[in-house]
Amino acid sequence: MKTFSLLFRATLLAAAIAATATTPALAKDPNVLRLGIDPSYPPMDVKMPDGHVTGFDVDLADEICRRIAMHCEWVEMEFSGVIPALQARKIDAIVSSMAITEKRMQQIAFSTKLFQFKSRLIARTGTPLTVSAEGLRGKRIGVQSGTQFETYVQKNWQPGGAEVVAYQSQEGVFDDLIAGRLDAALLGSVEADNGFLKTPKGKGFGFIGGPLEMGDHGTGIGLRKEDVALKDKIDHAIAAMRADGTYQKIAAKYFDFDVYGS
């Protein structure tokens, strides 16, 4: 009886494993595009009180999904984890204001450009800072981990004595800047001007120095290199949105200037 019971259990286990391996219901829905996003970067990527995500990135992606006949499914995660998640096939694309850089292009592919902004340093108004390696010596500069801003500070200011302080979220950067644990923060000028600096928390802070050139190729949608067909569809959708004025209408909801750049 005991032998029979063990054999019976083994048979059931084998059947369960086989069913798990072959059940079509567990396969990804081909009509769903899972998009990785860090919704902590207004006005580009924002999580609303009711839990849904919105922002310029989100509106653009929703329109792209509509045009390629797919449904956007937003997957929230820290920015530093989006490329590993894409490579592990936990998501299908990255839509999170990701700059197209030479380093990232070695790892993943990108759509054609979505927009292009300059970057700037922000600090408490009246802070006597000079935006240079010498002027920032001994200063604590906050950046979001995994961004081009972190790379820029490490390359240009850290060798001169600036301290790079990286955070998992942009909110963490702002919180420590407000608390006085940072001397300044580096981020996109539009995200700063249209986001943090226009909030009650941003009162008393402003830009230090002029726009900085990061050396990127604008911002795009991150994709796996092998997903050539998907990239082609997305690129065509972006071009069509630019041509028929839809892109400009979406941008006008957030900005009063040309965000696409030259």
What label would you give each PLM region?
Residues 27, 123-141:
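Flexible hinge/capping segments at coil-to-helix
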Residues 27-97, 106, 244, 253, ...:
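Extracytoplasmic small-molecule ligand-binding "clamshell" domains
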Residues 39, 115-123, 197-236, 255-262:
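Periplasmic-binding protein-like
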Residues 47, 61-70, 133, 149-168, ...:
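Ligand-binding cleft/hinge of the Venus flytrap
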Residues 63-67, 75-76, 80-93, 107-109, ...:
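Short helices/loops that flank or line small-molecule/ion binding pockets
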Residues 71, 148-165, 204-206, 236-262:
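Ligand-binding clefts/hinges and TM-proximal coupling segments of bilobed small-molecule sensing domains
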Residues 81-84, 96-106, 154-156, 183-215:
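A ligand-binding cleft/hinge motif common to bilobed small-molecule-binding domains
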